[in-house]
UniProtKB/Swiss-Prot annotation:
PROSITE patterns: INTERFERON_A_B_D. Belongs to the alpha/beta interferon family. It is found in: Secreted. GO terms for molecular function: cytokine activity; type I interferon receptor binding. The lineage of its organism: Eukaryota, Metazoa, Chordata, Craniata, Vertebrata. Keywords: Antiviral defense, Cytokine, Disulfide bond, Secreted, Signal. It comes from the Eukaryota. GO terms for biological process: adaptive immune response; B cell activation involved in immune response; defense response to virus; humoral immune response; natural killer cell activation involved in immune response; positive regulation of biosynthetic process; response to exogenous dsRNA; T cell activation involved in immune response. This is Interferon alpha-1. SUPFAM superfamilies: 4-helical cytokines. Disulfide bonds join 24-122, 52-162. Produced by macrophages, IFN-alpha have antiviral activities. Interferon stimulates the production of two enzymes: a protein kinase and an oligoadenylate synthetase. GO terms for cellular component: extracellular space. InterPro entries: 4_helix_cytokine-like_core, Interferon_alpha/beta/delta.
């Protein structure tokens, strides 16, 4: 358990440093909100992942949307916004309230909302720059389709605790990938 916690902490620290280099000035509260989101997602785990092995599924995570070499900074911010928005919507459903503690979900939604606010301000700033490309439609569509597959899976599994555990792990993967995207841009700067 300690190595997993150490890895999570390392990803969080990378994220905090990396987000500041995306070309806009996100407040320190954004870094704290990202840290809170990952911590809260970890705390949501109520079912042992090993007991849900039969529920695993390949949701075809759109890694190319987060890792394409042609992705510009403004596009990266748009992808991060898209992932955060869909995560907020996913954990705002009635099905999520039936599985997890409402207080914990409220804290998660508050942290996600803070991230959305920061990213929206950043998007407005980036859109004002001359020649700033907007999100490629295929990246946006790939993220939307991914979250749609997660939603359909939850419906198919009738929002079972194991289904939510699988989805929770997928969302953590998406946030980890967004951290990697942020780190890639930090290294370029």
């Amino acid at each position: 358990m300690a190595p997993a916690w150490s890895l999570l902490l390392a990803l969080l620290l990378l994220s905090c440093n990396a987000i500041c280099s995306l070309g806009c000035h996100l407040p320190h509260s954004h870094s704290l909100a990202k840290r809170r989101v990952l911590t809260l997602l970890r705390q949501l785990r109520r079912v042992s992942p090993s007991s849900c092995l039969q529920d695993r599924n390949d949701f075809a995570f759109p890694q190319e949307a987060l890792g394409g070499s042609q992705l510009q900074k403004a596009q990266a911010i748009s992808v991060l916004h898209e992932v955060t928005q869909h995560t907020f919507q996913l954990f705002s459903t009635e099905g999520s309230a039936a599985v997890w503690d409402e207080s914990l979900l409220d804290r998660l939604r508050t942290a996600l909302d803070q991230q959305l606010t920061d990213l929206q301000a950043c998007l407005r700033q980036e859109e004002g720059l001359p020649g700033a490309p907007l999100l490629k439609e295929d990246s946006s569509l790939a993220v939307r389709k991914y979250f749609h597959r997660l939603t359909l899976y939850l419906q198919e599994k009738r929002h079972s605790p194991c289904a939510w555990e699988v989805v929770r792990a997928q969302v953590m993967r998406a946030f980890s990938s967004s951290t990697n995207l942020q780190e890639r841009f930090r290294r370029k700067d």
